[in-house]
Amino acid sequence: MDAKLLEILVCPICKGPLVYKKEAGELVCKGDRLAFPVRDDIPVMLESDARELAADEDA
């Protein structure tokens, strides 16, 4: 994923920062505990496609 894109992307819900989890292929919002998928190097920033992080899962 492009580093410049990562710098400008924010969570579409809370506008907070995102952390790229390359091994999982996800952008994670720690504030909302949501993980947005990255498909073919394209982030899918739709709330309906995000998954909630489990209580024991590290954000």
Curated annotation (Swiss-Prot):
Q: Which cysteines are joined by disulfide bonds?
A: none
Q: Name one Pfam family in it.
A: Trm112p
Q: From which domain of life does this come?
A: Bacteria
Segments spanning the bilayer are: none
Q: Which residues form a coiled coil?
A: none
Q: Which GO terms describe its cellular component?
A: cytosol
Cleavable signal peptide:
none
Q: Which family does it belong to?
A: Belongs to the UPF0434 family.
State what protein this is by name. UPF0434 protein LHK_01103
Its source organism is Laribacter hongkongensis (strain HLHK9)
